[in-house]
């Protein structure tokens, strides 16, 4: 992509309404534009990152054996009245009436709809286990939307729902989701710590929130410092293997890690003092097991192998897809701008032409652009007739992990400059070697399946 042909409305000044780093940088980098309080248009650069994140979520859900689908944003109130949540949910749920005066709502979550659907079509234990998920826009009428996409009123969520015959099978689904979430966040360059949490309006007996440590987090968290040394890495997991999934759960949840709602001072005090930590955290996902609470209310039963009709055991599992952009920026930035992890960057590499209009420099940049594209990468070539300092500032602001700088002086020696955004280190290489180096880095970030 040529920057001269791209829509990238960067801002030189920091908008006054932006209170935290991620909001400031997303506005300055031309990623979003506020449409109304807590509601944003996603401009091309922001939309590209959003789709990168969405793809990773899809890939890891499919790798875990979960099945994608899509449910509507507008829901009838009938099912919510059956579950008792239409009145209990509160004013954050947007209620409306259609032209026939029927109660409708803009769904903040989908437990009722998915339970009714599965109850209609799944009648035998032979159809189990089953996990369905979708990625869809939601709306919650926050009293005070703030912090950009971190606490907006409209947001993109992945919601998954498992249906199982027994509690034991449903708890395996819970563990399977925990494993897939750990892998999902690491692919995005994040360490998201699973913490015991409160179940809130969804309900349930078991729940963990996944939190990214950041000074701007809304939650106060308490944890054993040893947990920050844990990495999922590239280990292979058989998601059908109960023992393997349970072992990962034990590894990542056996140490103390809780949000303020479930914090226990006595248990925390038992941790050696040099390992006790308190911090702020950004919630980026949550998993729940809530048994037969919804299936009993909404009539989702199956016939078991003894011919008895029994309610399904269920869980609900969410990832804040749009919120993740803010969390990644909060965790990965400097005073110059964003530093995207390779897994979610909008473009894989920037190309900066130091002397636009110079025939040799122009030809070298075009050749680099073609070579990177032939390697399966998406470069962003800054071909504008601007001063070099302005081009570097733009590249630093939008945070592409790698930059290739091309100028007449280097070309005389047959080299270009490859720079890492994260470390700031530069190296002179031949153009072919620079392309090979960038391609090698991204080989570890290729799609793992066809996704959707």
UniProtKB/Swiss-Prot annotation:
Reaction(s) the record says it catalyses:
tRNA(Pro) + L-proline + ATP = L-prolyl-tRNA(Pro) + AMP + diphosphate
Q: Supply the Pfam families for this chain.
A: HGTP_anticodon, tRNA-synt_2b
Output the SUPFAM superfamilies linked to this UniProt entry. Answer: Class II aaRS ABD-related, Class II aaRS and biotin synthetases
Annotated EC: 6.1.1.15
Where in or outside the cell? Cytoplasm
Q: Which InterPro entries match?
A: aa-tRNA-synt_IIb, aa-tRNA-synth_II, aa-tRNA-synth_II/BPL/LPL, Anticodon-bd, Anticodon-bd_dom_sf, Pro-tRNA-ligase_IIa, Pro-tRNA-synth_IIa_bac-type, Pro-tRNA_synthetase
Q: Which PROSITE patterns match?
A: AA_TRNA_LIGASE_II
Q: What keywords sit in the KW lines?
A: Aminoacyl-tRNA synthetase, ATP-binding, Cytoplasm, Ligase, Nucleotide-binding, Protein biosynthesis
Task: Name the Gene Ontology biological process terms.
Answer: prolyl-tRNA aminoacylation
- Main function: Catalyzes the attachment of proline to tRNA(Pro) in a two-step reaction: proline is first activated by ATP to form Pro-AMP and then transferred to the acceptor end of tRNA(Pro).
What HAMAP family does UniProt report for this protein, alphabetically? Pro_tRNA_synth_type2
In the record, the note on similarity to other proteins reads: Belongs to the class-II aminoacyl-tRNA synthetase family. ProS type 2 subfamily.
Q: How does it assemble?
A: Homodimer.
- Write down the PANTHER family for this protein, in alphabetical order: MITOCHONDRIAL RIBOSOME PROTEIN L39/PROLYL-TRNA LIGASE FAMILY MEMBER (PTHR42753), PROLINE--TRNA LIGASE (PTHR42753:SF2)
Protein's UniProt name: Proline--tRNA ligase
Source taxonomy lineage?
Bacteria, Pseudomonadati, Pseudomonadota, Alphaproteobacteria, Rhodobacterales
């Amino acid at each position: 992509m040529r920057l001269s042909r791209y829509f990238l409305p960067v801002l030189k000044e920091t908008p006054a309404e932006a209170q935290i780093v991620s909001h400031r940088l997303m506005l300055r980098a031309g990623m979003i534009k506020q449409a109304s309080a807590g509601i944003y248009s996603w401009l091309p650069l922001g939309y590209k990152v959003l789709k990168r994140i969405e793809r990773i979520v899809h890939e890891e859900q499919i790798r875990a054996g979960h099945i994608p689908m899509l449910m509507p944003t507008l829901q009838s109130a009938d099912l919510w009245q059956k579950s008792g949540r239409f009145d209990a949910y509160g004013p954050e749920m947007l209620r409306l009436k259609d032209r026939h005066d029927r109660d409708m709502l803009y769904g903040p979550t989908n437990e009722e709809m998915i339970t009714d659907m599965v109850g209609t079509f799944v009648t035998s234990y032979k159809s189990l286990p089953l996990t369905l998920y979708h990625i869809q826009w939601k709306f919650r009428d926050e009293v005070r939307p703030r912090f950009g996409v971190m606490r907006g009123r409209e947001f993109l969520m992945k919601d998954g729902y498992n249906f199982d015959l027994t509690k034991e099978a449903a708890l395996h689904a819970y563990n399977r989701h925990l494993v897939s979430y750990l892998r999902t966040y690491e692919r995005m360059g994040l360490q998201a710590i699973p913490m015991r949490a409160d179940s809130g309006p969804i309900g349930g007996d078991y729940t963990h929130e996944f939190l990214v440590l950041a000074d701007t987090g809304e939650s106060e968290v308490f944890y054993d410092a040893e947990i920050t040394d844990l990495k999922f890495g590239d280990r292979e997991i058989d998601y059908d293997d109960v023992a393997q999934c349970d072992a990962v759960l034990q590894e990542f949840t056996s140490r103390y890690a809780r949000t303020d709602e479930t914090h226990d001072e006595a248990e925390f005090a038992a941790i050696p003092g040099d390992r006790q930590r308190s911090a702020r955290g950004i919630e980026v996902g949550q998993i729940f097991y809530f048994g037969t609470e919804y299936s009993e209310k909404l009539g989702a039963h199956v016939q078991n192998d003894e011919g008895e009709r029994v309610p399904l055991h269920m869980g609900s599992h969410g990832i804040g897809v749009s919120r993740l952009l803010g969390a990644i920026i909060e965790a990965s930035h400097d005073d110059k701008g964003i530093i995207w992890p390779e897994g979610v960057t909008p473009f894989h590499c920037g190309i900066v032409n130091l002397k636009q209009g110079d025939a040799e420099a122009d030809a070298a940049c075009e050749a680099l652009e073609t070579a990177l594209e032939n390697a399966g990468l998406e470069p962003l070539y800054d071909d504008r007739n601007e001063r070099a300092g302005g081009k570097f500032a733009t590249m630093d602001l939008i945070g592409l992990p790698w930059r290739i700088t091309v100028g007449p002086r280097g070309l005389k020696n047959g080299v270009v400059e490859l720079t890492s955004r994260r470390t700031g280190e530069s190296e002179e290489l031949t153009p072919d070697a620079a392309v090979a180096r960038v391609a090698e880095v991204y080989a570890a970030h290729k799609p793992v399946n066809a996704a959707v």
